[in-house]
């Protein structure tokens, strides 16, 4: 998304940043776009709140998975956006299986971060079977997207 927005602005600095974000999300996520735009807004608003209200800054080495940034309510809201997004594309399962699969993995790429936040910060709120299911899907998605570490130079996943 950032590459799309920045490249458009390089060609025309009079374009509206937020309109470009919406344009990208609408084309990339199709029917799920309203949920992904809401997901984007929650993340943006959470960072803005932490910087402007709580006076917390997040440098390159900051722990951006902390509960200060991602409290339970925010994590739940992000999770619900993505579940709703997955439900919104269900019609493509039979009508256009190739598009369905493409959209599922685009949405599930975002789910990786949400699973990580939930597993690391809020695991006590979930049953052991629900948590195990999240961890298993996290590892499956990490493998699919060839993600092997949480941070550069890190040793892997903490669970």
Regions found by a protein language model. Give the residues of each.
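Catalytic domains of carbohydrate-active enzymes that cleave complex glycans
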Residues: 5-159
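Catalytic cores of enzyme domains
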Residues: 2
